[in-house]
Amino acid sequence: MQIFVKTLTGKTITLEVESSDTIDNVKAKIQDKEGIPPDQQRLIFAGKQLEDGRTLADYNIQKESTLHLVLRLRGG
């Protein structure tokens, strides 16, 4: 299924995923497309931050859902 990931810059990334994919998997796909390391990615859906070990199905994320990507920058 397709889902969309919207970045803070307003860019929308389209990903091909399965409901059984973990949030880790999704972050890896974002890394493939955008080059952003997963440890800097925070994914938000319906106001909740998504935890790595959970699946899209756990959060009831269905086709054509839009997730929001927030970058967590290190230290400073």
UniProtKB/Swiss-Prot annotation:
Location of the Ubiquitin-like domain: 1-76
Cross-link Glycyl lysine isopeptide (Gly-Lys) (interchain with K-? in acceptor proteins) residue location(s): 76
GO-annotated cellular components: cytoplasm; nucleus
Cross-link (Glycyl lysine isopeptide (Lys-Gly) (interchain with G-Cter in ubiquitin)): 48
Keywords (A to Z) from UniProt: Cytoplasm, Isopeptide bond, Nucleus, Ubl conjugation
Domain of life the protein comes from: Eukaryota
UniProt-annotated location(s): Cytoplasm; Nucleus
InterPro entries tied to this protein: Ubiquitin-like_dom (IPR000626), Ubiquitin-like_domsf (IPR029071), Ubiquitin_CS (IPR019954), Ubiquitin_dom (IPR019956), Ubiquitin_ubiquitin-like (IPR050158)
Function: Ubiquitin exists either covalently attached to another protein, or free (unanchored). When covalently bound, it is conjugated to target proteins via an isopeptide bond either as a monomer (monoubiquitin), a polymer linked via different Lys residues of the ubiquitin (polyubiquitin chains) or a linear polymer linked via the initiator Met of the ubiquitin (linear polyubiquitin chains). Polyubiquitin chains, when attached to a target protein, have different functions depending on the Lys residue of the ubiquitin that is linked: Lys-48-linked is involved in protein degradation via the proteasome.
Similarity comment: family membership: Belongs to the ubiquitin family.
Record's protein name: Ubiquitin
